[in-house]
Amino acid sequence: GRGVFARRKLKSGMVLGEIQGQIFPVEPDDPSYCMELPSGRVLEPAAPLRFLNHSCDPNCELFYWFDEDGSLQEDRLWLQTIRSINAGDELLIDYCWPADAAIPCRCGTPDCRGWIVDPEELHLLPRQEAPGALPRQTTPDSPAAGG
């Protein structure tokens, strides 16, 4: 698959840029890369940021910009780092999909939820590991290890 990678070391809290692309009033026929905006419209990002991959332990996040008067710029979405990132590391976001759109996650992080889903909606999904998810790491004292 594709991804987006840092060309140089990035500091935590850096605004990397605006997610630009085509805005649709409704979800297009192929919504694979689309992001819902607060206005209810849908943004289909342009390359390269359309290739941001998911992780349950992301190093970047998406945010909405507010004008000086505090009003939300509803159709403007930005990307920023949430921790330091080394040159060559992949930029990763948490997709936070609603439970009704969740799919199995294979990010492989120690805190993988097993599903690509908004953490606040994880309780709506089956408690067992998602089919095909990488096994969670266990320690000798963890319940999964029998300790």
Q: Where do the model's predicted regions map?
A:
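Catalytic cores of histone-lysine modification enzymes
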Residues: G1-D69
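C-terminal SET catalytic tail plus cysteine-rich post-SET Zn-binding segment of SAM-dependent SET-domain
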Residues: C56, E61-G147
